Amino acid sequence: MNKLSIFLLLFLSVAYSVQSSNTNYARTTDRIWLDSNEMHQGEYSWKMMKVSDVKASAEEVSSLGYNTSDWLSAIVPGTVLNSLVYNKKYPEPYYGLNNKIESNKIPDISKVGREFYTYWFRTEFEVPASFSGKNIWLQPDGINYRAEVWVNGNLLSTINGMFVNDYINITDFVKVGNKNVLAVKVYPVDVPGTTMPKSWGAVGEYHNGGNGNIGLNTTMLMSIGWDFTFMDGIRDRNTGIWKSISIYSTGILALRHPFVKSELQKPGYDVARETISVEIIDPFHSMDTISGVVRGEIVGENIVVEKPFSILRGEEKNVTFTPEEFPQLTIRNPRLWWPINKGPQNLYELKVTVSVKGAVCDSVKTRFGIRDITSDTNTPDKSRVFYVNGKRIFIRGTNWIPEGMLRTSDERTYAELRYTRQAGINLIRLWGGGIAEFDFFFQLFGGMGVFFLK
């Protein structure tokens, strides 16, 4: 085999290993994902209207039969401004000087007030027959900034903060097999702040974050402008349902936040001690204490652990499995995770189920890698050196800044991280003035051999 053939074989092998990781592991098929058909090719039609232009009550807006024929099509996940531009109410902000505040082409919230960008978002959905007799949950993963969540004429939750996800039990408020209505009233940030003129010069001379008042909110600080955004920030401060909303069902108990902590034995790095944790939720189903069993399985490794528990009405309980209690959680000669160009990105899968009286109530899964990361300054100039699984690694890092108007998708995220990997980058700093990224984003890190620093 000549050198060219060997090179092509290696290139295709690497390309295939990266390509094979582009499926969103977090998007389980047992959920209903309420993404819009506009821009996201989802299955749901969303409409939006400025709250001040709606005369009907919230109960009417969120009930079947309400007429939205004069409402605008909405992009969900997305923002108010994304949808307004999509409906050609305002010009494309990224084109020419359209977004310059002096142009007055797109109203800035600091001049027109919060009410101008306060909107209703509305859609209709069906609950499948398979959800009958179960607890039914509505999960908004991110709304900026405050929101009222209405289902079939009932206010079921209020959300405060851009990076808050919510778990809303809608069991008693939806009809299985029939149409239901979800209406979300979305409010902008409490303190929008104002943009400030940017003088040309060194980075330190720019007015990052406008007048600084945007920092009074827990939100995307760069939405008001930063030293890399010449065009004066985002006019609506990215108000909207910016992450997906999903619907799913569980039994009388629910599971959340499965996590695996790995500890490698040194100096051989040939023994791994795994600690598993998960949260159990009792959504006020019973007045009595419920007893059950939590089962954890590291798939394909013949490692299974079980633990009985009792939980009170409305309680959230954390259950932990340690290698001291369960010797099978000590793995000998584990397949280690390595960063790009240092070895394979081996990943394990954990599946956790919770059962009551032998019936499975809920199951969750997550993927994890086994690795050890350390650093020291034992160098002549006291510079920091990093080690992975005891091997010295040279850090090639970069900064990660989100798309300004939050126009993103799984396909775009995958492409951008793939390009980053192909550039030889092995560490990304998630800049604090941006967002809390999507689950899919972090999934790709593990599969591509890239670290992240927050």
Residue map of PLM features:
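Short acidic/polar inter-strand loop motif in beta-rich domains
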Residues: Y187-T194, S355-C361, G390
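Active-site-adjacent substrate/metal-binding segments within catalytic domains
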Residues: N82-V127, F131-Q139, Y145-N152, S157-N160, ...
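Short glycine/proline/serine/threonine-rich loop/turn segments at secondary-structure transition edges
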Residues: F131-K134, V174-K179, P192-T194, M287, ...
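Surface beta-strand/loop "capping" patches
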Residues: G251-H285, P380-V385
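Beta-strand-rich binding/interaction modules
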Residues: V149-V151, D270-L312, K317-V319
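Bacterial Sec-dependent N-terminal signal peptides
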Residues: M1-A26
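Accessory beta-strand-rich segments of carbohydrate-active enzymes
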Residues: T23-W33, K47-D53, S57, S83, ...
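Internal, hydrophobic beta-strand segments that form the core of beta-sheet-rich folds
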Residues: K185, I340-S355
